[in-house]
From Swiss-Prot:
<dbReference type="InterPro" id="IPR001706">
    <property type="entry name" value="Ribosomal_bL35"/>
</dbReference>
<feature type="region of interest" description="Disordered">
    <location>
        <begin position="22"/>
        <end position="45"/>
    </location>
</feature>
<dbReference type="GO" id="GO:0006412">
    <property type="term" value="P:translation"/>
</dbReference>
<dbReference type="GO" id="GO:0022625">
    <property type="term" value="C:cytosolic large ribosomal subunit"/>
</dbReference>
<protein>
    <recommendedName>
        <fullName>Large ribosomal subunit protein bL35</fullName>
    </recommendedName>
</protein>
<dbReference type="InterPro" id="IPR018265">
    <property type="entry name" value="Ribosomal_bL35_CS"/>
</dbReference>
<dbReference type="InterPro" id="IPR021137">
    <property type="entry name" value="Ribosomal_bL35-like"/>
</dbReference>
<comment type="similarity">
    <text>Belongs to the bacterial ribosomal protein bL35 family.</text>
</comment>
<keyword id="KW-0689">Ribosomal protein</keyword>
<dbReference type="InterPro" id="IPR037229">
    <property type="entry name" value="Ribosomal_bL35_sf"/>
</dbReference>
<keyword id="KW-0687">Ribonucleoprotein</keyword>
<dbReference type="Pfam" id="PF01632">
    <property type="entry name" value="Ribosomal_L35p"/>
</dbReference>
<dbReference type="GO" id="GO:0003735">
    <property type="term" value="F:structural constituent of ribosome"/>
</dbReference>
<feature type="compositionally biased region" description="Basic residues">
    <location>
        <begin position="35"/>
        <end position="45"/>
    </location>
</feature>
Amino acid sequence: MAKVKMKTNRSAAKRFKVTAKGKIKRWKSGGAHYNTKKSSKRKRHLRKHTYVKDNMLKHVKALLKEF
């Protein structure tokens, strides 16, 4: 019997990006609405990307088929 390929989770593929070095880049949450009460500094930092932490890396890679 042929081996079945895993499908990529499309919602995860739109939210995460694998860099050339193999790190997984993500964007910070909390900047879409209710921004009037947030400081300019906080909103500026929310615009920047960050990387997936080591303890979540295995789960995200499974969603992206990155084994």
